[in-house]
């Protein structure tokens, strides 16, 4: 334990918290342009073709973003909105595309959990 005199001379250092989503620069979402849309395979116990896209953001960062939901309409030069949130079984994917905003369509025929996939309420 430090004495009061030692703390007066040299105060305690604050721990600096490192951001999980540095490319957002403390913003809730960021806009960007798709530079490449492709599929990748997940890490060891899982098996699938996960849809991801490489996005050049308005602040100059280039990040990999996951496209959630069944089916999508994204291609190169599509303008997308990305949010934070990593995909545990895809290394290097720390962002999600926001469905139903800008050029990204919502998931069609979605009945439950619609707000997460940008789907309007069915009539």
UniProtKB/Swiss-Prot annotation:
Extent of Basic residues compositional bias: 113-123
Q: What is one Pfam family matched by this protein?
A: Ribosom_S12_S23
* Gene Ontology CC: one annotated term: small ribosomal subunit
Q: Which residues carry this modification: 3-methylthioaspartic acid?
A: 89
Q: Which GO terms describe its biological process?
A: translation
Q: Does the keyword Lipid biosynthesis apply?
A: no
Determine if ATP-binding is one of this entry's keywords. Answer: no
Keywords, sorted A to Z: Methylation, Ribonucleoprotein, Ribosomal protein, RNA-binding, rRNA-binding, tRNA-binding
Give the span(s) annotated as Disordered.
Answer: 100-123
Query: Which superkingdom heads the taxonomic lineage of this protein's source?
Result: Bacteria
Q: Tell me the GO molecular function terms.
A: rRNA binding; structural constituent of ribosome; tRNA binding
What does this protein do, in the record's words?
A: With S4 and S5 plays an important role in translational accuracy.
Q: Which family does it belong to?
A: Belongs to the universal ribosomal protein uS12 family.
The record's note on quaternary structure and interaction partners says: Part of the 30S ribosomal subunit. Contacts proteins S8 and S17. May interact with IF1 in the 30S initiation complex.
Q: Per its record, how is this protein called by name?
A: Small ribosomal subunit protein uS12
